Design a protein with these regions (language model features):
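Hydrophobic, lipid-facing positions within transmembrane beta-strands of outer-membrane proteins
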Residues: 121-127, 269
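Periplasmic alpha-helical coiled-coil/stalk elements that build and connect Gram-negative outer-membrane
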Residues: 137, 153-269
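Small/polar (Gly/Ser/Thr/Ala-rich) solvent-exposed segments
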Residues: 96-118, 128-157, 176-179, 281, ...
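Extracytoplasmic/secreted envelope proteins and their assembly/folding machinery
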Residues: 53, 62-65, 79, 89, ...
């Protein structure tokens, strides 16, 4: 027990030595950007967060975005990377605290001459602690912390990218649906024009050139419709991939463009907008991680100080302690 007391006193006396840190100081560089947008902000707030796509007031779009965020494989991978980084940060934190190990040993002997036997039970407790003299352990902890924060921004960037792609494919499907509907109506008109032109040609009212031109216009519209139909199929496949599947129906896919409200865009100064991007935040955090890695490597050449202590007892001593705890 005296060893443990001395160890605790030593830990308190040497904890202040961590002030000898050799960590680098990070300074965010100043950006040469315009102080404000050239256009008027019209009094809108400089921060816009949350489910901003709901500003379009389209329930089908809202359901589709939520389905993509729940089922997309990239979101799951980014989530797993974040969990792994958080576990790494928790593990790095344990390097700054004492490590404790306990053992329980038992042994027995028997005298072959007189048949007497004896047994011993020996529990032991060991403590070890590395004093972070130069900030090496703190640098390792900072690395894990920066990586965890960067992984969180990676998840946010993946989420933002998927939302953008979902909206893009959604409106592409809507536009192509409207274009196909309009093209089908135009094709029907061109077919009627061709029939009328053919009748006039057979009656001698128009030349063969007029008939050929009418037929070419119909054929051109048919080719255009075929291209639009193929593009719509490709947009549907892209949306299925966002949903994490390669086939099946798209219940919330639009058939035509619907004119609805367009949400206002919150405007701020360019530097603020740039700093809010998750990919920019992740890059800055990983830069700080790199600086911490350099600190760890540099301080790794310095001497280290480790404190250890232990306590053990045998079965006889343990029995006495249990019988007389005041001793």
């Amino acid at each position: 027990m005296h060893n443990l007391s001395r160890l605790g006193l030593s830990l308190m006396l040497t904890a202040s030595l961590g002030a000898c840190s050799q960590q680098s100081t990070y300074h965010r560089p100043d950006l040469d950007v315009a102080p404000a947008w050239q256009q008027e902000s019209r009094g809108l707030t400089a921060q816009q967060a949350g489910p901003w796509w709901q500003g379009f007031q389209d329930p089908a779009l809202d359901r589709l975005v939520e389905a993509v965020l729940a089922a997309n494989p990239d979101m799951r991978v980014a989530g797993l990377k974040l969990k792994n980084a958080l576990l790494g940060a928790d593990l790095a934190d344990t390097n700054l605290t004492p490590s404790v190990s306990a053992n329980l040993g038992a042994s027995g002997t028997k005298n072959m001459k007189d048949g007497s036997a004896s047994s011993n039970l020996g529990p032991s407790l060991n403590l070890s602690y590395e004093v972070d003299l130069w900030g090496r352990l703190a640098a390792a902890r900072d690395q894990a912390s920066w990586e965890a924060q960067a992984s969180e921004q990676d998840l946010a960037a993946t989420r933002l990218l998927l939302i953008g792609k979902t909206l893009e494919q959604y409106w592409q499907l809507a536009y192509l649906g409207s274009a196909i509907t309009l093209g089908t109506q135009q094709l029907a008109n061109l077919e009627r024009i061709e029939r009328l032109t053919r009748a006039k040609y057979e009656a001698g009212a128009v030349t063969r050139l007029d008939l050929v031109q009418a037929s070419q216009q119909k054929a051109g519209k048919q080719a255009e419709l075929a291209t639009l139909t193929q593009q719509r199929a490709q947009a549907g496949n892209a949306l299925r991939l966002l949903l994490g599947r390669s086939s099946g129906s798209l219940a919330d896919a639009p058939d035509a463009l619907i004119m609805g409200p367009i949400p206002s865009v919150a405007a701020g100064i360019p530097a603020d907008v740039l700093a809010r991007r998750p990919d920019v935040r992740a890059a800055e955090l990983r830069l700080r991680k790199t600086l911490a890695r350099g600190d760890e490597i540099r301080t790794g050449f310095y001497p280290t100080l480790s404190l250890t202590g232990g306590a053990s007892t045998t079965s006889d001593t343990l029995t006495q302690v249990l019988q007389n705890p005041d001793r």
